[in-house]
Amino acid sequence: MKALLDLFKQVQQEEVFDAIKIGLASPDKIRSWSFGEVKKPETINYRTFKPERDGLFCAKIFGPIKDYECLCGKYKRLKHRGVICEKCGVEVTLAKVRRERMGHIELASPVAHIWFLKSLPSRLGMVLDMTLRDIERVLYFEAYVVIEPGMTPLKARQIMTEEDYYNKVEEYGDEFRAEMGAEGVRELLRAINIDEQVETLRTELKNTGSEAKIKKYAKRLKVLEAFQRSGIKPEWMILEVLPVLPPELRPLVPLDGGRFATSDLNDLYRRVINRNNRLKRLLELKAPEIIVRNEKRMLQEAVDSLLDNGRRGKAMTGANKRPLKSLADMIKGKGGRFRQNLLGKRVDYSGRSVIVVGPTLKLHQCGLPKLMALELFKPFIFNKLEVMGVATTIKAAKKEVENQTPVVWDILEEVIREHPVMLNRAPTLHRLGIQAFEPVLIEGKAIQLHPLVCAAFNADFDGDQMAVHVPLSLEAQMEARTLMLASNNVLFPANGDPSIVPSQDIVLGLYYATREAVNGKGEGLSFTGVSEVIRAYENKEVELASRVNVRITEMVHNEDKSEGAPPFVPKITLYATTVGRAILSEILPHGLPFSVLNKPLKKKEISRLINTAFRKCGLRATVVFADQLMQSGFRLATRAGISICVDDMLVPPQKETIVGDAAKKVKEYDRQYMSGLVTAQERYNNVVDIWSATSEAVGKAMMEQLSTEPVTDRDGNETRQESFNSIYMMADSGARGSAVQIRQLAGMRGLMAKPDGSIIETPITANFREGLNVLQYFISTHGARKGLADTALKTANSGYLTRRLVDVTQDLVVVEDDCGTSNGVAMKALVEGGEVVEALRDRILGRVAVADVVNPETQETLYESGTLLDETAVEEIERLGIDEVRVRTPLTCETRYGLCAACYGRDLGRGSLVNVGEAVGVIAAQSIGEPGTQLTMRTFHIGGAASRAAVASSVEAKSNGIVRFTATMRYVTNAKGEQIVISRSGEAMITDDFGRERERHKVPYGATLLQLDGATIKAGTQLATWDPLTRPIITEYGGTVKFENVEEGVTVAKQIDDVTGLSTLVVIDVKRRGSQASKSVRPQVKLLDANGEEVKIPGTEHAVQIGFQVGALITVKDGQQVQVGEVLARIPTEAQKTRDITGGLPRVAELFEARSPKDAGILAEVTGTTSFGKDTKGKQRLVITDLEGNQHEFLIAKEKQVLVHDAQVVNKGEMIVDGPADPHDILRLQGIEALSRYIVDEVQDVYRLQGVKINDKHIEVIVRQMLRRVQITDNGDTRFIPGEQVERSDMLDENDRMIAEGKRPASYDNVLLGITKASLSTDSFISAASFQETTRVLTEAAIMGKRDDLRGLKENVIVGRLIPAGTGLAFHKARKAKESSDRERFDQIAAEEAFDFGTPSAPAEEPQHPAAE
């Protein structure tokens, strides 16, 4: 009996392990796993349902069917445990061993493992140095391979056909050996001496010069070294023994009616066994070679299908023509083992239901239906019932609960008290998608949710469902309460803004209450306090919006900081305010001034208000305040009684005339087009322009009319005040709707797009109040349907982007406080087109300064390096006008395997410095992925209005100051005395008196400068102007024009202007030129001086050559005198076709995948002077001579726009040919900082367009992960191979080791990988395999004998350990510390013992943690 009780006590202790290793199994290893050989293909006897002996389900091999009972029934009961029945040979034990015991099949002929053969690049091919095609021919018995050439002229591994073989046998007899099939390949593999091969390859690598060979050798070397290091023998890639999966993992289930449902694996195994047995028999019978060969080939194919069906040839199919699911299919893909069972498990103690609004709840509560709670907390209730003695057994308790007796409800209340539950709404796109609440029991069947947390869950009450989960253990409850409780998560981790902002009716109520009206009832009255105002309002003496004077008591921070002094003291002030605002002042938290409420509260204002409360009053007060705001908002909205009707949509009276005028203009353009003055494209662009301007004008007229209304003030004068129109108030407050939607209701609907994105040129002139006619309705259906289709696509794409981002960053966790680096990036305000898009304060808030921040006026240090810049700091920095701050960034963090808190800065979701253990990688991925669904999917065609609006024609200063030009600015003075810019990348800056940069503007080539360097100017002064429609070609030298290759009809064509009748020459496109000869020439101009000599570039022997691009209109004549700064030709900007701008989600994906754009711009590889070399066919040759005098050539297609001209000095990394930038080039030539700035700015552009705020540091975290691999350029004395890509941390560790040993470290280049590539190339094979390309990843890992140190989150989830983040990080740290201290104690005791016996002391070996196989 005691043994029985002990048995129940033994809880299987899970083994503690720190790593998992994968490798190739040797045949002996497979046999050692096996409990017996499966000899027969039979499964179970269909009459008795007992497994057949020696078959696939044999009880003798795999274990008993029933617990502690042998097959024939001779031994039953526990007492026979471990006995092997002599009748049926079955061991008496637990039936669950059928899930663990494996069998094996001895193959009659060896078989190649298809993964190592067919998974590209073929591992077998690499080891043998043969092509995949050749190996396949040998394996599938189509050709012979020479094993030992002997004394013959044949070479080893040579392939020969059967015919060849017989001829050679006749010629040389048995001097040589050739084989076919897997035996042959196995012999070749056995013959390989790996160490020797590695040596030869290393020497070959050093001595060879050809790129292709280096690549090939390096690849082979990598595979061979892997075998060498892991101790795996190459011949193990050929199987002699096939393991058989335990039968419970490939079950056979009897259905009713005598049929069976079976796993496909059983079919596949049966086929292998049948063919194997047939082959054995044929070999015994000494059958003819050709029959045996065919059988061997069939066996190879059967094993192939079992391992990876469909990898080679046609997939094996079952009875219903469906391909069978092989072992490989079991683990890969969304339904495979990794993603279905290991990363996404079903959860006990959970339920789901529809959500309804719970306006009476506190922020940290949720309403839980009683029945649901009863079910979820059942075990807790059973326990309580037993403890209280209401029920004696679990069974009795169960009955009690099922009958729902009153005592059960009381106990439920008790159990639920202070026991948080977690609510989750799918899709969980960021961490706020799961939050913890304290349950409040309610009647009904729907979960009640607090309205303020809806924004975080992205929930609404139109039928959304949510799931409830119960944290069981004490630790889980504690974490849920401290970390996940809704009232502790009030900020968005993406940008640090409050997530508990009111929306819709709350906003409307607050807005209505804080508006002011002219001449409201009781205007001008004075009140002694808020209570008096409330009394007057309740008695209808005053209206909500009336202006009154009120004495208001504010609680302000106490200046007196001494002991026992109260933190807040009252301060009484008389405010001119409105009744509504005075009433709201009641709920103001201590420490906030009344001024924050003394304005109309729109949605943005309320968000700012809550943010201020959080920063000034702390979390607790903010949560209470938000709750009270919500209550007030609902109450006031109800009291306001706002509703809308058709009459609220006021159509502007000017609409008719505006639309009429537009129609006239359109007719005029049609007429011009008919008479051939404009092209069809121009006409279309103009028409679209007119209509979009018209709908703007109508919209503006409508808004003007809606937004104000005439009133009479107290003195009887007519004035206008902001309107109380319901529709206007809803849009203005941010409660619902927008100006655009109102425009469709009361203005005109405007232009519509076709499904392909092009705009239909006839707009919808009606609005919804007037109603649409049939045609208009039909046109608008396009857009509506496309919207729905787009949304569906977008969700999938956005989800996939998030998945890739999470995968690449999942192992990035904050692991230490400070890595001590002195690197960082310089942050400036982000300026575009002279506008400040993102202020400096927003970019440095919550970052750690890396250099001292100095007051520019007094030169004293304001903030030392290492200071976390909070709100007060950034406000001070902004006030002093500091325009650049160097801050720490995740990109330059020197922590290996993780990040440090200082480089990351503030945890945006908590508002303080990030904690060690925070999974910042996943947070970054979620912050970028979550708003993905709000981005657009389409590619924008910028044409017509949009492109014209985007073109500027001048720059003007926004602030007073002094003009300064950058070093790259060059200009010449023309005959009229104007300064003409001839540099491509010149910029003008405005600096203040202290020389601090205030703004910066690009000044394009050909602009006329109106202010020169050093001029003092006022805000609003124009700095430069230019013609936006054409780009000029300007001469920097004077002289007589001499044309070269300018031949009419060959390189140029004459164009006659319809209106003026003047003729100009236009350079024709290369493709349209007739003869071959004329394709390679380039029309250009040389200048002659007074003596008829060619004008030279000063200081060189080169003549001045000015080339004309395709489409240029040449404005000078041959032989004409020109002055410096004169225009030789103009290139119409229209000729630069409207280029498609990839926007939205595809653009973000493109950036993170680090794709090189097609037609990328070219950057200068070196710093030097440019010149043009001899042109080749269709290409121009640009030469850069560096400072040492070396020449670097670039070949550039003729139609590309070169941004530099002769003899210009360019810097390394400067753009010399126009086009989209290639991130890889930026990294190579400008470094990590420039790359990060490029990616961050580009990604932010996309999100900013949609009004989404994301903090830069999230994008930087992802860029860090994209840069985590390096390419070895010189391997020094390390184990790396030149050209190999390795993990940065590995390389740094190895280099540290080399330096410690006094050897030569490796040198390397940074490599930028796209997120998919980066995820697949992580060190953890478990994580990579669960992401994509499972087969390839596992094949590679097995050969390398890779060890996964379980550093990331994903690997740990998969093996079922606590993840090394948050509390899990602390847990693992503590565990490892305890292990090492235990080990030290063990060593110490061992040493003492050894000393006592006077035995010679041997060095104690550290017991290493065994890696689980």
From Swiss-Prot:
SMART domains noted in UniProt? RPOLA_N
Cite the binding residues for Mg(2+). D460, D462, D464
**Recorded catalytic activity of this chain's protein:** RNA(n) + a ribonucleoside 5'-triphosphate = RNA(n+1) + diphosphate
Q: Where does Zn(2+) 2 bind?
A: C819, C893, C900, C903
What is one cellular component GO term in this UniProt entry?
A: DNA-directed RNA polymerase complex
Record bears the keyword Zinc: yes
Q: Mind listing the UniProt keywords for this protein, alphabetically?
A: DNA-directed RNA polymerase, Magnesium, Metal-binding, Nucleotidyltransferase, Transcription, Transferase, Zinc
Q: What's its EC?
A: 2.7.7.6
Specify the enzyme's EC class, one word. transferase
Cofactor(s) of this protein: Mg(2+); Zn(2+)
Q: Quote any Pfam family the record assigns.
A: RNA_pol_Rpb1_1
Q: How is the cofactor bound?
A: Binds 1 Mg(2+) ion per subunit.
- The answer to whether the entry has keyword Transmembrane helix is no
Recall the GO molecular function terms of this protein's record: DNA binding; DNA-directed RNA polymerase activity; magnesium ion binding; zinc ion binding
**Biological process (GO), any one:** DNA-templated transcription
Record-listed Zn(2+) 1 binding positions? C70, C72, C85, C88
From the UniProt entry, list the residue stretches annotated as the region Disordered. Answer: 1392-1413
UniProt-listed NCBIfam families: rpoC_TIGR (TIGR02386)
Q: How does it assemble?
A: The RNAP catalytic core consists of 2 alpha, 1 beta, 1 beta' and 1 omega subunit. When a sigma factor is associated with the core the holoenzyme is formed, which can initiate transcription.
The entry's function note states: DNA-dependent RNA polymerase catalyzes the transcription of DNA into RNA using the four ribonucleoside triphosphates as substrates.
Q: What is the similarity comment for this entry?
A: Belongs to the RNA polymerase beta' chain family.
> Which HAMAP family did the record assign?
RNApol_bact_RpoC (MF_01322)
Query: What name appears for this protein in its UniProt entry?
Result: DNA-directed RNA polymerase subunit beta'
* Designated gene of the protein: rpoC
